[in-house]
Every structure is written in C-alpha cells, then in structure tokens.
A protein has these predicted regions:
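Hydrophobic alpha-helical bundle segments that form small-molecule/ligand-binding pockets
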Residues: 116-118, 128-154, 191-203, 207
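Helix-turn-helix
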Residues: 6, 10, 14-52, 56
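C-terminal regulatory/oligomerization modules of transcriptional regulators
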Residues: 85-86, 90-93, 153, 169, ...
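All-alpha amphipathic helical-bundle segments outside canonical DNA-binding/catalytic cores
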Residues: 82, 122-126, 141-159, 176, ...
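Short, basic, alpha-helical segments at the C-terminal edge of helix-turn-helix-like DNA-binding modules
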Residues: 59-65
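Amphipathic C-terminal alpha-helical segment
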Residues: 94-97, 159-177, 188-198
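Amphipathic alpha-helical segments used for helix-helix packing
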Residues: 83, 98-119
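Hydrophobic alpha-helical connector segments
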Residues: 56, 70-101, 151-158, 200
Length: 212
C-alpha cells in the first residue's frame, strides 16, 4: 500500500473511532488529525468537507460488514439460526464492555446526522440493507421457518428489535432492557420454528379422500 493510501486510511480509522466513541457532531477535524497523526493539509486533501469524511466512514462499514461484524460469530457458530442470536449477543457484549457508551455505529450516526446530512442517508440505508441481507440469509439457510413467513420482513424486525434494545440499554445504562427485548424476540422466533415443525409432521390418521 502506498504512503498516500496509508494516510487516507489512517484518517478514516481515526474518524471512525472518534465518531463511535464521542459522536459525529462532537468530533472536530482537529481532533481527527491529532488522532490520526497527520497534518490538516492531508485531511483536506482527501476530504474537503467533514461530510466527505462521514461518507468515507460509512463506505468503510459497508465494505467491512463481514470482517467487522459477522466473521467472529460465523466462525464459532455453525447453525444459521443461532448465528442470528450470536450477532445480537455481539451488541450485548459491546454494551457491557464499553459501559453502554457504544452501540450500533450506523444507528448512532443516523440519530445524529440523518436530517443535517441527507447526502449520507442513502449510504446509511445501504449499511442497514446489508445487515438485513445477512440476517435474511441466515433464516433462509436454516430452513426451520414456516414457508409463509416473509424472511425479509423477519430480518427487518430483527434489526429494529436490536436497534431499539441497544438504544434503551444505553439510555438506562442497564442491560436489562436489551435482554428483555431479545428474550421476547427469541421466543417469537422459536414459536415460528415450532409452528413449522408442527405443520411438517406427518399426521397419524390422514384423512382419506371422499369416494365419488
């Protein structure tokens, strides 16, 4: 990698860390250059505006959803359906390890900048769509859900459950709201699985067709 690309990557990494730890609006460009160990001229060369840097950070998340979010869970959990709960548990662990300071990086940014930076909104939505894609694929690979369940809708429901649970846990500075939401969510999914098993079970006394 050239020194030019290394400098650009250092700036993106610094911005990503600061946005996650203290928020987009609370992060100044001077902080980013100091955190990255670069001169301000380098920052403005790559990112003329702060929104340009925001978009670069969102691009990073989009390109690294597997390595940054899914890989750890997928490598230790083979069952596709349990991978969904493993991903959710990853957010739980982040909340606890950071004393509720960090949640979902994209969710945090949406709350801060979706109105003030509409140019970044499509990329935020793309990040959410990728998350939903991954969860939907887990549901599909599991083969455990009823055929009449819309797997895309269920994946969106998973995302909204996670985002709401993270937000409440951070607000209360307590993991209980997160756990309560996930317990109810798991119960719902397990009921769907049970329904699928019930409908697929052979009946003991099948009804004979009517004689003509």
């Amino acid at each position: 990698m050239s020194e030019t690309l290394k400098t650009r990557d250092k700036i993106i990494e610094a911005a990503r860390d600061l946005f996650l730890n203290q928020g987009y609006n609370s992060t100044g460009l001077a902080q980013i250059t100091q955190h990255a160990g670069v001169k301000s001229g380098s920052l403005y060369y790559f990112f003329p505006t702060k929104e340009d840097l925001l978009i670069a950070v969102l691009d990073f998340y989009k390109a690294n959803i597997y390595d940054g979010l899914l890989k750890f869970t997928y490598e230790r959990i083979s069952d596709p359906l349990e991978r969904v709960f493993g991903v959710l548990d990853g957010y739980r662990q982040m909340l606890l390890m950071t004393n509720f300071e960090m949640g979902c990086p994209i969710g945090n940014l949406v709350l801060e900048v979706t109105n003030s930076h509409p140019g970044a909104r499509p990329l935020m939505n793309t990040n959410f769509d990728q998350w939903v894609d991954a969860i939907e694929e887990c549901f599909r690979q599991s083969g455990k859900l009823p055929e009449n369940v819309d797997l895309r809708d269920l994946a969106v429901f998973t995302l909204t459950t996670m985002e709401g649970a993270v937000m409440l846990a951070r607000s209360y500075r307590d993991i209980a709201p997160f756990d309560q939401a996930i317990v109810q969510y798991r119960d719902y999914v397990e009921r769907l699985v049970a329904d699928a098993m019930e409908w697929s079970r052979p009946r003991a006394n099948p009804i004979s067709p009517l004689e003509p």
